[in-house]
Amino acid sequence: MTNMSRVERRKAQNLYEDQNAALADDYVDDGESLPTRQSVKNQREQKKKQGKTKTPLFTVLAVIFVFVPVIVLVTLFYLKSHPDNHDDYEDVFIDSSQSKYEVVPKSEDKNDTADTKETALQKESKKEPEDSKPKEQTAADKKQTAVAEKEDSPNKEEATAAAASSSQSTVQQQEQPAEPVQNVPNRVVKHTVQKKETLYRISMKYYKSRTGEEKIRAYNHLNGNDVYTGQVLDIPLMDE
């Protein structure tokens, strides 16, 4: 719809310009002639040409797409025609004894390389027996320690068993409670608990202190300090 409307407007504008050009040809204002129809058309065409902006991007892209394959082909052809010359390189050998890189020039004889290899092999052969000696010593030491451990294992087991038995006996002796030394009372008094009488009062009556509570409780096999009215208690007394 937008394209059709633009075309229609463009046609109406062209028609309007043509009409103005026709009127300009027929009328003369103040003795000066108006531009002709042909001149108006020429001006309009020039404006259209000037309105079209020339974008160089398309031309640049076209040139790039043309020249890139050409450059690639030229480089490939050059590389194929001029291969790398490997004769210019020199051989490099590594001496394991010094751990340094040595560059052997191409002009030297091959005998030097053979000599260096022989010296390296001799040094390695000397190092091998020296390295094997400590390994043999360590193996012999391990064997001796294993034999000694086997010989000592029965003695260790006997010692551990004796220590365990002694520790068990000591623990049992410690766990056994010491038998309390019971003092035999000189005489025992029968006491009948009266109303509102407590173990504390009975102790103060016979022993004049609270130490008698424990004695009365132990002698009568009481679990606590509670006594009831009418209960008969045995009061052990020690004559001083």
From Swiss-Prot:
Bias (Low complexity): 160-185
Domain LysM: start-end pairs: 189-235
Q: Where in the cell is it found?
A: Membrane
Q: Where are the transmembrane segments?
A: 57-77
The record describes its membrane topology as: Single-pass membrane protein
Q: Which GO terms describe its molecular function?
A: lytic endotransglycosylase activity
Q: Where is the composition biased (Basic and acidic residues)?
A: 103-159
Annotated Pfam families: LysM
Return the GO cellular component terms, semicolon-separated.
Answer: membrane
Q: Which UniProt keywords apply?
A: Membrane, Transmembrane, Transmembrane helix
Which InterPro entries does this chain map to? LysM_dom, LysM_dom_sf
The record ties this protein, via PROSITE patterns, to: LYSM
Region span, Disordered: 26-52, 100-185
Top-rank taxon: Bacteria
Name of the protein in question: Uncharacterized protein YpbE
Q: Which organism is it from?
A: Bacillus subtilis (strain 168)
